[in-house]
Amino acid sequence: MNIFSHANLGTTEERGDDAKRTILAGTDIVGDILKTTLGPKGMLKMLKGQHVNVTNDGAFILNNLMIDSPSARILIGSSTGQDWEEGDGTTSVAILASLLVKEAGKLEMHPTKILRGYRMAQAKCEEILSSISFEATKEDLLKLVRTTLCSKVLRYDLERFCEICVNAVEKLEGRNDLNLIQIIKCSGKLEDSYLDDGFLLKKDIRIDDVVNPRVLIANTSMDQDKIKVFGAKINVNSVGELEEMEKAEKIKIKGKVERISQNGVNVFVNRQLVYDYPLQLLRMKGIQAIEHADFDGVERLNNVLGGKILSTFDNMDESCYGTCESIRNVHVGNERMIKFSGVRSGASTIVLCGSSKEMLDEAERSVHDALCVLAKIKEDPRVIYGGGSSEMAMAVGLNKYAMEVPGAESDAILAFSSALQQIPKILADNGGYNGESIKASLRAEHNSGRTSYGVNVRNGSIGCMKEAGVVDSLRIKHRVVTAASETAQMIIKCDAIVKCKPRERTRE
């Protein structure tokens, strides 16, 4: 089918230089927006929409942008993928990809040769990263979290939050299920934040303390009058018939309570409301009911207590019940919550205190990034030095590698190297220093073999990142380079932009 036929008058196409300019403009927009947020001295962005958000989280910024450019949307998708896979490095992916596309635009050669050179450069970068990596110690884990959080809002109380994040992950005892770590937000001062053992359920209800409880978690209706609840209508001939219906409903709900109370259950957590009559029956059985718990809380509670979320109570066995050491009321800030202590799997709760909703939301995103980095380092414990040292090490290695490669591909490898060298320059620029001068000095140090040297944003100089304690995860850095390179190659290979006519909608 010819999409440019007279039947598709709404279809438009850009080719040649016009298409390349449009594609480059889209990637430049994303790169320019994000590059000022990179590093410890990165700036914040104020996002205005339904709510105002202040953040420097790359994935959050990109997901809230309204951009029509197709090349920009590809970068956003790549950054979002980085967030899903690794939890950190989202800003670096988008910036590096935009720089690679920009450097490729300066080369006057066929895109196929550029792509071949970029693939060769990508493979060489993977070799260089592996050669400069080393196994992380427990001290390196703290350094890794510091590097992650130093560019976030939590940098003002860095040591406290580093300790909170490391302890929370260590409690998992080798498991990488971050769903076992809950984050609760409340009003207060940031320095009042802490790590609490156990699980906190956000439910303002008073309960008696229970030791070694037997918990049944459910998502089931606990009302005996569905006619009133659903607004249905029935026709009866007498009040007696209505009374018989009421009795039948009560008998039904009583049977449900009997099934709930079997096998020694003393705490019942329900996703839905528990009405007065079943609540009375549960109390008579010595069962404490927690009703209308939020869905996310019920899912997490089921994970940490064990058992199952039930909707019916037939054929129950031991696997249906959860347990912990104790349940009691606690106050977090100005809110009353229910604490489940001594839960399995090393679950814990991070309580974040802040003066505003915007501060709490940004703190939550920062803690999530740090937890993701720590979880991934358990899978691959290798780390590298940060501060732009790894990017410059790859760039210098590519410069030497390009001298060995014949043909036009060497120019593409040098372009890849040039893009990598922009990362330490951006780090220095964001600190208010002379980025070009620092980049040149850092390149000279790496040419002399000092591969651990990077940008010291505290004093605007270059220094040893080993002494400064700045480390990055090898796994995350490897994926940043891979994702940015593959995204850039996809964009470079495009030679036209086709905008199709929207499908016509008709009433049938």
Curated annotation (Swiss-Prot):
UniProt subcellular location: Cytoplasm
Principal place of residence: cytoplasm
GO CC, any one term: chaperonin-containing T-complex
CDD domains named in the record: TCP1_beta
PROSITE patterns for this protein: TCP1_1 (PS00750)
UniProt GO molecular function: ATP binding; ATP hydrolysis activity; ATP-dependent protein folding chaperone; unfolded protein binding
Protein keywords: ATP-binding, Chaperone, Cytoplasm, Nucleotide-binding
Record's subunit section: Component of the T-complex protein 1 (TCP1) complex.
Protein family per UniProt: Belongs to the TCP-1 chaperonin family.
NCBIfam families for the chain: chap_CCT_beta
Purpose of the protein: Molecular chaperone; assists the folding of proteins upon ATP hydrolysis.
Designated name of the protein: T-complex protein 1 subunit beta
Organism listed in the record: Encephalitozoon cuniculi (strain GB-M1) (Microsporidian parasite)
Gene transcribed to yield this protein: CCT2
